[in-house]
């Protein structure tokens, strides 16, 4: 009985630590991408071309379905459109919304394809029918990781929501005075890249802070200190 309770506590603790580790990794990668925007754009562009080439080779060599492969290539063309305004993206833009739909449909169609093991009705009583080779778990997981999830996940980490902020003191010193300061001595706002991953993580963190306040706990965001 006690051992079972310990196993539940260990499972929950492991899940929480895993979630925090993934969130920390996403936060770090998002900050890293913000500092190296142009190399990230080139990497994503080449990755999209490479995955399209892989899909074509799978069609020719492994007999993947033509229509589904063509649909996946069309999805990657849609993903590529997000790079035109990289790293900034509008969450209500048609391209971004269409990309979200493509991610869901592409995952669903490929999952259905690999999970379909039924024999076609016209071949059920054919003794010479050779069923399609069923892919192993490693093959399916690798295909989904590289050809289905990699680019959407990379775009989620790399793309940024525009946020208008005041320029820093060093930026004001290095930039021209007429460009940074208006005639009314009011500093102009500039657009800063804020990664979508950071936006999501910060939103979740703020929600946890507000939820803790409801139960009478005060978390100071500057020091992450919990006070009653």
Curated annotation (Swiss-Prot):
GO CC terms: COPII-coated ER to Golgi transport vesicle; endoplasmic reticulum; endoplasmic reticulum membrane; Golgi membrane
GO molecular function: COPII receptor activity
Function: Plays a role in retention of a subset of membrane proteins in the early Golgi compartments. Facilitates endoplasmic reticulum to Golgi transport of mannosyltransferases MNN2 and MNN5.
Pfam families assigned to the protein according to its UniProt record, in alphabetical order: Erv26
Record organism: Saccharomyces cerevisiae (strain ATCC 204508 / S288c)
Predominant location: Golgi
Subunit comment: Interacts with itself. Interacts with KTR3, MNN2 and MNN5.
Transmembrane segments: 2-22, 43-59, 89-105, 143-166
Bilayer disposition of the protein: Multi-pass membrane protein
Sugar attachment sites: 115
Subcellular location per the Swiss-Prot or TrEMBL entry: Golgi apparatus, cis-Golgi network membrane
Record-level GO BP terms: COPII-coated vesicle cargo loading; endoplasmic reticulum to Golgi vesicle-mediated transport; fungal-type cell wall organization; protein retention in Golgi apparatus; protein transport
Origin: domain of life: Eukaryota
Protein name as it appears in the record: Protein SVP26
Cytoplasmic face residues: 1, 60-88, 167-228
General remark: Present with 1810 molecules/cell in log phase SD medium.
Keywords annotated in UniProt: Glycoprotein, Golgi apparatus, Membrane, Protein transport, Transmembrane, Transmembrane helix, Transport
């Amino acid at each position: 009985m006690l051992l079972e309770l310990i196993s539940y506590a260990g499972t929950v603790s492991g899940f929480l630590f895993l979630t925090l580790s993934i969130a920390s990794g996403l936060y770090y990668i998002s900050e890293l991408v913000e500092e190296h925007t142009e190399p990230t754009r080139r990497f994503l562009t080449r990755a999209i071309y490479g995955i399209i080439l892989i899909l074509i080779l799978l069609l020719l060599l492994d007999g993947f379905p033509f229509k589904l492969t063509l649909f996946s290539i069309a999805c990657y063309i849609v993903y590529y459109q997000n790079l035109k305004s990289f790293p900034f993206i509008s969450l209500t833009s048609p391209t971004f919304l269409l990309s979200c739909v493509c991610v869901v449909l592409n995952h669903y169609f490929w999952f259905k394809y690999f999970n379909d093991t039924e024999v076609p009705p016209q071949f059920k009583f054919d003794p010479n029918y050779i069923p399609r080779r069923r892919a192993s778990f490693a093959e399916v997981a690798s295909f989904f990781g590289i050809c289905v999830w990699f680019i959407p996940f990379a775009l989620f980490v790399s793309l940024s929501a525009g946020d208008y902020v005041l320029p820093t003191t060093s930026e004001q010193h290095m930039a021209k005075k007429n460009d940074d300061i208006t005639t009314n001595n009011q500093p102009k706002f500039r657009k800063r890249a804020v990664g979508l991953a950071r936006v999501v993580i910060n939103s979740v963190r703020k929600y946890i802070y507000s939820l803790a306040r409801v139960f009478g706990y005060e978390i100071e965001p500057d020091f992450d200190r919990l006070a009653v």
